[in-house]
UniProtKB/Swiss-Prot annotation:
Family indicated by similarity: Belongs to the mimivirus R1 family.
Organism: Acanthamoeba polyphaga mimivirus (APMV)
Main EC class the enzyme belongs to: hydrolase
E.C. designation(s): 3.6.4.-
Signal peptide: none
Purpose: Probably involved in DNA replication. May bind the genome origin of replication (ori).
UniProt keyword terms in alphabetical order: ATP-binding, Helicase, Hydrolase, Nucleotide-binding
An example Gene Ontology biological process: DNA replication
Molecular functions (GO terms): ATP binding; DNA replication origin binding; helicase activity; hydrolase activity
Protein name according to UniProt: Putative replication origin-binding protein
ATP-binding is among the record's keywords: yes
Length: 795
């Protein structure tokens, strides 16, 4: 609106419209009109009596076109970049060629733009970074090889990756250049001059001298391919499990390596704001933007799974070679029985580790199969360049337990050459392309609000001053410089939040359009149900067949660290940790185990919330304990500072706010004032009138609904309009409160109907989930069994 109001101040937005109405096939645009007819059209320079205009979003930014016949053949008016990244890309060195280096070595004829840029970069000590934005399949790997072949003074190189598959692929391409893969090495890696290493293992390149000072190499060159994926990896839960370093400290160690290195090379198909911030942190840079479009793909979205599978299987029956890109590994498990007797390969996190080794020569390996399927375990690092696959099919999934829309396009891009450029995609969620999505400013505002609520710092370099008056302590922010880590984390949170079901297609559509591809919809009002396949064995049934007691878990953990696990051994570990998380003692009763797994496998987060909120876990996580910590506004360092610096981790901050919202809900419903609750504190029956009063009180007075826009992301809720507080919207408020409490293992539900004063009305119950409590009590030694699953839980 800022762009268009510059030319038409009285503009009104009318939504997104399909372009075929105006003979603009496969184009979607933003439609506008304006009321002041004296405003001059910026395209023709004349005033129109009635026509409106539209704006198209492209990979180059926003362009305005007018509906008037006088403007029909005139050039579109460029309005500006679609976001801050567009300006960053627009200011780069622009090229448009199939390969970054078309012919010859760096110093060889013919003269080429990228060759000159590389020579300038490596000969100028003042230019730290070369950043290359170029589509997949345009020779980024070849360009790096030519750099290493030409410059023999680049001896010490650190190549940072974020996926084991990427590390394998890089090693396969560069082992002849003297690189070693961290996955093949034991112990400390300080002595290796050319090293490929995953972010998670960066601590292995540091050593300590006799005085316990940290020592690491000064590298001639640090390379980060797939820079956007690397930045997003700092959201990984596996990094948070590191007992030696916090995620923030791991990030700082990476910065130290890069800051002291002589040169930095970063590459990706789509450099975003995370990349820009990262690049700018190290001083002067040269950015190259390759505008070449290898294959223009058409993503066709259907919500009919039955039809999707019929078309897929028909293509396979006709002998076509197909690739199935799935955001859900479990969907591939369901598909696998349909491939019986065919040549196929499936890559998921549960696949045999030997398959990872095959990816070093993927162009040879995948050609053996008619069908290739993979989950987000292959997001990057695999470049299949052969003419082999006729079609790609995509299974899309939203939510926090899968990859982002950006990662999906990375997955699709693994296949460089494709017989049919139309990609059929199944998606069961909403298909609106104009949803209100989360932005950087949204997430920044939320974290600022969480700091205020918790009284603890979340974003680094935010300085507070402590004021004490009338026995109350007030923390006021006096400066607000955000560290690079926090900037990038906020962008990561934006990407994560926009995986919400209502925003998923909107974000995917924008990314597809910006990449020069298109999206079309072929949805039906009532999709056919897929008939259950009796040949499919559920994942729970597969786990039940495994006797984990026959394996030594410590040996499997050692094999896991060396990437030597078989598929069966991975399932053993999965079952072992599932049982450990829930406190299951005995899985010999297979039927009971299957029932338990199907019921609770997807509720680990609910159990985590339940244990923390009701005080089963470390008491330092409770709300009461948080109140008494003063170290966060002083110069003191807390004890055990190796993993917990003076800042709250971002997730800890969100958990603390969630807990306070739950306490606030319960206090308002029960009309009490408590700082926290134990599992014995809930067990109430409310009359109809008490229930009605409670829900309206929560709607009117709770901290959640007072700042709903700030708190919705905490509970995976989408942005949108707020509901007025009235009887008409009563069900909405009750449904929201019920769902939020349920995410903590607290039940608030309608019970039996009773006659009260000659009228029939319902009772309402507020209590902890008995089954969840029984399981948690057993795990913490507070009970001897779980009534519903006595064979799994016994002493």
């Amino acid at each position: 609106m800022t762009y268009v109001k510059k030319y038409h101040p009285t503009t009104k937005y009318y939504g997104i419209i399909h372009g075929e109405k105006y003979e603009l096939q496969d184009v979607l645009f933003y439609s506008f009109n304006y009321s002041n007819r004296e405003e001059v059209c910026p395209i023709s320079g004349t005033a129109h009596k009635s026509n409106g205009f539209y704006v198209i979003e492209t990979s180059k930014g926003y362009f305005m076109k007018c509906h008037s016949d006088k403007c029909k053949n005139k050039k579109a008016k460029y309005l500006g970049p679609a976001d801050a990244t567009d300006m960053f890309v627009k200011c780069a060195n622009q090229i448009d060629q199939q390969y970054l280096i078309m012919k010859g070595g760096i110093a060889d004829a013919p003269k080429e733009p990228v060759k000159d840029i590389i020579i300038n970069w490596l000969s100028n000590d003042k230019i730290k970074t070369l950043a290359v934005r170029s589509p997949m399949g345009t020779g980024k790997t070849t360009m790096i090889k030519k750099i290493l072949d030409h410059y023999d003074n680049i001896k010490k190189i650190l190549w940072i990756s974020h996926r084991q598959t990427l590390s394998k692929q890089i090693y396969g391409s560069f082992k002849n250049h003297g690189f070693v893969n961290y996955m093949d090495q034991k112990g400390n890696l300080f002595e290796h001059d050319r090293l490929i290493i995953q972010i998670d293992s960066l601590k292995r390149i540091f050593k300590y001298d006799k005085d316990y000072n940290t020592v690491f190499k000064q590298y001639d060159l640090v390379i980060i391919d797939e820079i956007e994926g690397n930045m997003n990896h700092f959201m990984s839960p596996y990094l948070r499990k590191d007992s030696d370093f916090s995620v923030r400290q791991t990030f700082q160690k990476m910065l130290n390596c890069i800051d002291t290195a002589k040169k930095l090379l970063v590459l990706d198909a789509d450099l975003g704001m995370r990349s820009k911030l990262f690049i700018d942190n190290f001083g002067k840079s040269i950015v190259v933007n390759n505008n070449y479009k290898p294959i223009q793909k058409i993503f066709e979205i259907t919500n009919d799974l039955s039809s999707f599978q019929e078309i897929l299987l028909a293509d396979i029956k006709d002998g076509k070679n197909v690739c199935v890109v799935s955001m859900s590994a479990s969907y591939l498990d369901k598909l696998e029985p349909k491939f019986a007797g065919l040549k196929y390969v499936i890559h998921t996190s549960k696949s045999d580790d030997k398959l990872k080794n095959e990816l070093e020569n993927v162009n040879y390996f995948w050609k053996k199969f008619q069908i290739c399927c993979f989950s987000p375990t292959i997001e990057c690092g695999v470049d299949f360049n052969e003419k082999h696959f006729d079609k790609i099919y995509c299974y899309l999934k939203n939510g926090s337990k899968t990859c982002s829309q950006r990662s999906l396009l990375q997955m699709v891009g693994r296949i460089r050459q494709l017989g049919n450029n139309k990609i059929l995609c199944y998606y069961s969620g909403p298909t609106n392309i104009d949803a209100d999505i989360y932005t950087y400013d949204d997430i920044l505002g939320y974290f600022r609000h969480y700091e205020k609520i918790n009284g603890r710092k979340v974003l680094e370099n935010v300085e507070y001053k402590k004021f004490i008056a009338n026995g109350e302590v007030t923390l006021k922010r006096v400066s607000a410089n955000i560290s690079l880590f926090d900037h990038i984390h906020i962008y990561n949170e934006v990407e994560e939040s926009n995986k919400n079901h209502s925003m998923f297609i909107t974000v995917l559509f924008k990314l597809i359009q910006r990449a020069g591809h298109s999206m079309i919809f072929n949805t039906v009002e009532e999709p056919e149900e897929v008939e259950p396949d009796n040949n499919v064995i559920s994942h729970a049934e597969i786990l039940s067949m495994i006797n984990e007691t026959k394996y030594k878990i410590s040996d499997l953990m050692k094999k896991q660290s060396k990437n030597q696990l078989s598929r069966t051994e991975k399932l053993v570990l999965e079952k072992y940790f599932f049982m450990k998380n829930f406190g299951v003692k005995d899985s010999s009763n297979k039927d009971e185990f299957v029932k338990f797994h199907k019921k609770y496998a997807n509720k680990e987060i609910t159990f985590k919330h339940f244990k923390r909120f009701f005080g089963y876990d470390n008491p330092n996580n409770s709300i009461d304990e948080l109140k008494h910590l003063d170290i966060f506004v002083s110069n003191k360092k807390p004890p055990n500072n190796n993993n917990n610096n003076f800042l709250d981790e971002h997730n800890d901050s969100k958990d603390a706010v969630r807990d306070k919202i739950i306490v606030n809900f319960l206090n308002l419903i029960l009309d009490v004032k408590k700082n926290g609750y134990g599992p014995d504190d809930l067990g109430y029956t409310l009359t109809q009138d008490e229930h009605n009063t409670a829900v309206l009180t929560v709607a009117e007075q709770s901290m959640y609904f007072a700042n709903e826009d700030k708190y919705r992301p905490l509970f995976n809720k989408n942005k949108g309009k707020f509901k007025e507080i009235n009887e008409y919207n009563f069900k909405h408020y009750f449904k929201t409160v019920k769902a939020i409490l349920q995410s903590y293992g607290i039940d608030y539900y309608r019970g039996n109907r009773k006659r009260v004063n000659s009228r029939r009305e319902f009772e309402y119950s507020l209590s902890v989930d008995k089954q969840i409590r029984d399981i948690v009590d057993f795990k913490f030694g507070l009970s001897d069994t779980v009534d519903e699953f006595p064979n799994l839980f016994h002493k």
